[in-house]
Structures are given as C-alpha cells and as structure tokens.
C-alpha cells in the first residue's frame, strides 16, 4: 500500500518526517561547530541538499559536515576562516557543480581537487538527463526534480562505496532505501500537482530556481517535448539571485502575469522580497494578484531536503488550486 494513501499513514508520515528532521539536523553538522566523535573519516558536502542524502547513505559510519548551511546563498558564498581546514581533513568533498559554487575562493579549492565529487558534471558525463541552461549558463537547481536528484544520489553512493569499500553493503542498502522513497515522493508530487487546473499552472518566483520542477511537475508531455514548458515559469532574477533587478525585469514579469491571468506569486525564503512586492503593486488595476501565504525553499532547506521538497509541492499545489493527495 502506498505510504500516502490513508489518513492513518498521513499521520505516521508527518511523525516520521519530524524524526527525520531531527536526525538529519544532527547528522549533518554545521561547518561552524561541533568536533566529531570519530576523527578518522570525514565527508564534506557543500550544501544541505547534498548532506541530507549523503548522511542517509553513510549512517554513523562517517562524520558528515556541511559547508554552506542555513540562510546563506550558495551562489555567492565565499570561503571563511576554517573552511580550508575542513576541506583538507575531509576524505571526500561533494559539490553540486553546474556553476552553483562559482565564487573565486570556492573554485580555487574545488577545481582540480582529486577529493571532489562534482555531481552535476557526473550527470553531464553520463548524459542520463537533459540538464537545463539559461543564456549559455547551466542551471544548477537539479534537486528540485526528484528524478534528476535521484540520479545524483546514485553518484553519491557510488563515490562513497569506491572511497570506503569496507562499508559497501551498508551504503548500498541505505541508498536503495532512499531511492525507493524518492520514487514514491516523485509519484506523489506528480499526482498532486496534476490536480492543478491547467490554466493555473504558471509559477512566478523570486529567481529562476524552479525550471527543473516546472518541466517535471507542471508541464504536459507535449510541452516537455516541444520546449513550451518554459512558458510555465518566470522570475525577475536569473539563475543566481546576485544581480540587480531592473525596472525592465519587473515589467517583463508584470506582463507575463497579465497575459496568463496569474493570481499568485511565490516568495522564496532567503531572497529579498522587494522585487515581488513591486510586481504585485505594479500589476494592472482590476487584476487579482497576491503573494503566496508561505514561501518556497529554493537554495536551502527548512528541516531537511525531503520535507522541504514536500513543503514546496504542498504550497504550490494548494496555492494554485489543486489538491494535495495523501
């Protein structure tokens, strides 16, 4: 029976998510804090989306630490005191790649480093998914599509097993369990988001972090083939929220909202809200437009990666007039 099908299992799921959140908060230690109990094996992940998955694979076999945590923009992160030491003491370093860690200080320590596992580059090399780009730059937000991120999890497991073959059985068993859960979440997300009326399937967000999500969950098969799925999402900022937003950017989104009768725009947890508030205020008179009640999480997580994905699915489904299926 599906894990989401009954009210009983709904309650069980929420309880498990709370426990998982507590577990993951402890298993992915902040790079700013606690000394490990076992100093022999360290694995460093560049962000929580990666670390939450790596820690599920490794369990307590290694000490997992995360470099970029909390409400910090991974696009613009510059290394601080202690980061170089954390990289030096780690046997493996997992990065997202695809231009996410693009600051000069990070590139200096990641590029050419034999300990680095570049997940995005591995997916590109295998050509197993059509990875996206915008104006010639790769889109790094692969964790918003559960299928693509599942392929990244397979690469995490493969790298961990290669580095620590003594734990192969445990790591593979844990990875298989995670992948099974991710397949279930992917099906649940697709079913829930498909209940949104087609005329409402337009996603307006703070920056262009939800293209993978839109292609997978808000578009038809025909739109994915033709590329017309791109018309289902828009934002005033590009792939990275570092650039200044111009009046032209704002008016471009205002016209999109008007043309597609969009009624809801979505704030993002770590982004400045001024641009979207201006967009709402600039909308044409008589048009109903409002901010979503809850922000989305794009470049960070709330409790952990898995509950964050569920939060985004629930928020988008409910705000756009669909029904969250349990």
Swiss-Prot record:
The entry describes its oligomerization and partners as: Monomer.
Give the signal sequence positions: 1-21
Record GO terms (molecular function): metal ion binding
- Its induction, per UniProt? Up-regulated upon iron starvation (at protein level).
Q: What does this protein do?
A: Part of the ATP-binding cassette (ABC) transport system YtgABCD involved in metal import. Binds Fe(2+), Mn(2+) and Ni(2+), with a preference for Fe(2+) and delivers them to the membrane permease for translocation into the cytoplasm.
Protein name as catalogued? Metal-binding protein YtgA
Which residues are Fe(2+)-binding? Answer: 75, 141, 207, 299
Q: Where in the cell is it found?
A: Periplasm
Q: What coarse category fits the chief subcellular location reported for this protein?
A: periplasm
- Transmembrane stretches, start-end: none
- According to its UniProt record, which protein family does this protein belong to? Belongs to the bacterial solute-binding protein 9 family.
Share an example GO biological-process annotation for this protein: cell adhesion
UniProt keyword terms in alphabetical order? Iron, Metal-binding, Periplasm, Signal, Transport
Q: Give start-end ranges for the coiled-coil region(s).
A: none
Which Gene3D superfamilies does the entry link to?
Answer: Nitrogenase molybdenum iron protein domain
- What is one cellular component GO term in this UniProt entry? periplasmic space
State the organism's lineage: Bacteria, Pseudomonadati, Chlamydiota, Chlamydiia, Chlamydiales
């Amino acid at each position: 029976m599906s894990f989401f099908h009954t009210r009983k299992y709904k309650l069980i799921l929420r309880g498990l998510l709370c426990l998982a959140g507590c577990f993951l908060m402890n298993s992915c230690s902040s790079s700013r804090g606690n000394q490990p109990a076992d100093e022999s094996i360290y694995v460093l992940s560049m962000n929580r989306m990666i670390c939450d998955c790596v820690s599920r694979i490794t369990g307590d076999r290694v000490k997992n630490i995360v470099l970029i945590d909390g409400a910090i923009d991974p696009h613009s992160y510059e290394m601080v005191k202690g980061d170089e030491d954390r990289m030096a003491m780690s046997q493996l370093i997992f990065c997202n790649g695809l231009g996410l860690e693009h600051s000069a200080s990070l590139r200096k320590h990641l590029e050419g480093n034999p300990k680095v596992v570049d997940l995005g580059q591995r997916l590109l090399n295998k050509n197993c998914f059509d990875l996206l780009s915008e104006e010639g730059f790769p889109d790094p937000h692969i964790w918003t599509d559960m299928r693509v991120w599942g392929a990244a999890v397979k690469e995490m497991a493969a790298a961990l097993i290669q580095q620590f073959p003594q734990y192969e059985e445990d790591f593979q068993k844990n990875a298989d369990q995670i992948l099974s859960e991710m397949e279930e979440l992917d099906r649940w997300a697709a079913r829930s988001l498909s209940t949104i009326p087609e005329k409402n399937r337009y996603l307006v967000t703070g920056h262009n972090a939800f293209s993978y999500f839109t292609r997978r969950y808000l578009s038809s098969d025909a739109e994915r083939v033709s590329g017309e799925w791109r018309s289902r999402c828009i934002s005033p900022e590009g792939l990275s929220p570092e650039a200044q937003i111009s009046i032209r950017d704002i008016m471009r989104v205002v016209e999109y909202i008007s043309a597609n009768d969009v009624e809801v725009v979505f704030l993002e947890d770590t982004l400045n809200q001024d641009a979207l508030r201006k967009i709402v205020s600039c909308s044409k008179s008589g048009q109903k437009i409002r901010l979503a009640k809850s922000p989305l999480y794009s470049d960070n997580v709330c409790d952990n990666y898995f509950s964050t994905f569920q939060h985004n699915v629930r928020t988008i489904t409910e705000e756009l007039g669909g029904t969250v299926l349990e």
